[in-house]
Amino acid sequence: MIARPATIAFPSAPEILTDRLRLRMPVYGDFAHRQAFYADARSVWEGGPFTAEQAWRIFASEVGQWPLMGFGPFSMEDRASGEYLGEVGIYQPEGYPEPELGWFVTAGAEGRGIAAEGARAVMAWARASFGWDHIDNYIDPGNARSIALGLRLGGVIVQAPGADPTDVVIRHDLRGAA
């Protein structure tokens, strides 16, 4: 079991740079992108589509994990253009057995390796910051693309509790991530 940090070292997201991405603290202006995602049929794997009010509650509660837990979502933007590309991060709302590595990308960012690049950076950050030896994905069994990505990132399917009893749980060994 992964323990939550005893002290909150990161009340706000640090900036993480990769070859193509800038991972940063989400800001209010990012909500329009989240709202668009949650209104779209692509959000079905997260329980959507959602109304604007529901999307706001999800967005605000996820961003609120930073001061409460010391981790949360990062907004991903293109380093060259500043274009918003999606979100990647560590989530643990009430009821999740352990912190989860999750992601979503805008429709225009799909198929470009954006989620993978962001996820690798977050895994390395989690290992370096918290010393965790693993992190899981909790993925709806119908979400073949996210399952494939979790496996491409080096994760393995394990029999462990997820956020939902039907979730496919993919575990990533972080010991080589930092």
Feature map (PLM): residue ranges:
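Beta-strand acidic-aromatic groove motif in beta-rich domains, primarily in extracellular
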Residues: G70
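Extracellular/periplasmic catalytic domains that process cell-envelope and extracellular macromolecules
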Residues: P67
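Acyl-donor (CoA/ACP) binding surface of acyl/acetyltransferases
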Residues: M1-E46, W56, A60, G64, ...
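PAS/PAS-like sensory domain cap-loop motif
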Residues: G48-F50
